[in-house]
Amino acid sequence: MNPKNFAKAGLVAALVVAANASVAGPDNMVVAVQQLPVIVEPQGINNNALDRVAYSIYETLIRADLKTGEFFPGLAESWKRVSPESVEFKLRKGVKFHDGTDFTADDVVFTFGQERFMAKDAPGRAAAVEFLGGLKSVEKIDDYTVRVTMQQADPLIERRFAARMSEIISKDGWMKAGGWDNWIKNPIGTGPYRITSFKVGNRLALERFDGYWGDKAPAAKLTFVEVPELSSRVAGLRSGEFDLITEVPPDQIKPLSKDGKIDVVGGAIDNIYALVFDAKSNPVMANPKLRQGIMHAIDRDLLVQALFAGKTTPANSFQSKTFGEMYLPEFETKKFDLQKARELIKASGYKGEQIVWRIQPAYYTLEMTVSQAVASMLKQAGLNIRLDVKENWTQVEAAGKDRMINNASFSAYFPDPASQLWRRMKPGSFWEAEGYFPASDEYKRICELGKELDSSVDPVRRKAVWGEMLKLFDANPYAVPLYSLPMIYAKQKNVVWEPGTQGSLDLSARGLSFK
């Protein structure tokens, strides 16, 4: 799509909100996002757009604080380990789904069952397998007790069932809908807000769920509206049409902060912005030396200082300091070395063939600007780069010989390496299933080690395994990290809200209030 058309689309969306919404505030909170998800079923897709809205609609058995990662009871009142492979959950009584039906163990079993997830061709499996591929069974012990069992010992069961893809849905709602195709038109959760309408590419309208078991939602109505153009989001915020806007670039922080009615919040989150390579579809990308050359050609420090005013940090490896003892600082040494990049590219046998890099104009903060800057760096290293602007993820990730590089983010959905690089690269993950990764000795070994990372309960061994995985990935990179993804927001001053370390927005009574 022509960038001018994106601007028009953003203006139209803003006008639609202005025409249909009352004054922004606790009666009708409006959040302007750069892109809405194409589906609001929690296992429908894995991306930042769905992360942003799912937290308001659905709940997991365990809740993890979005700022600290600390556990607190969700749909389960308590839980205990019964073996290295199993956790037993005692479910909360008196919880209602948005359609008024009772939440019981049957809903938990169905959520992870054959029809939705466990079967090989189940509709939720493609997105959720990266998170829950090791699940063996979810058994009903009684109406308010379930036992989750993994295929092998797993030190992270509790983390997995507090993260995305583990949100509980209504079995009764699914059955009445007659299956996935109708269900996704009006999915039902237990969260503080319920869906009233959803139009892809336009708006997602929610309302306070009066039957919610916990503290009532602070906003009577909550609307997410798609406004791709930054200037339209900013204009809507200044005029009072929007309460909160996403994807604010650093150069807008000072101008917006000078507005006495607006606050700017946020910063780097536990998510690494990166380039992903299809090393299989086109022989140009097959040689690991060429991909290593790309890794060393990018000046991450310059990107962070010049484009993000130091509001984020460079990433030289796929790690987060929230990993604690599993964080390996020795892998964070600077990768930028232009001479080394040129030598590796020459050694790869590269002959100047065009390398296509598919991007979207503004899915990520400054996506176009960053892509142009990095493309310039890669050209200095001797690569013939062509940026190919696409409208959506379907076009970006469509199979073909011109699928060579695309932008992506690597969220750490919980503070452990298993939640980030390995989750996105393991067998059965989206990119592996879509044919991005060719067979190689390094990838085979990474997969062997990844299984051990998922199953070992020995912290010392897990740390050693993770270090070996990072070494192998540097030797044959299928992606290269750039920086921690910044998530900067601007909001009305009467909105009391702070973002966490994830892309999810907590707009419940725990996270939101109004002055």
Task: Label the model's feature ranges.
Residues V23, K80, A127-G173:
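Surface-exposed binding/hinge segments that line
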Residues A32-S83, G113, N186-P192:
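N-terminal lobe/hinge region of extracytoplasmic solute-binding protein
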Residues Q35-R52, L75, T101, L156-E167, ...:
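A structural "hinge/loop" feature
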Residues D65, E70, A162-A217, K221, ...:
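Gly/Pro-rich hinge or "lid" segments in bacterial periplasmic/extracellular proteins
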Residues E77-D121, R147-T149, R233-G236, V284-A286:
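Aromatic- and charge-enriched surface segment that lines or borders ligand/interaction sites
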Residues D181, F209-P255, N384:
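Ligand-site clamp/hinge motif
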Residues K199, Y273, A297-M326, T365-A375, ...:
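Detector for C-terminal structural segments
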Residues S281, T313-A347, Y363-M368:
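Structural transition elements
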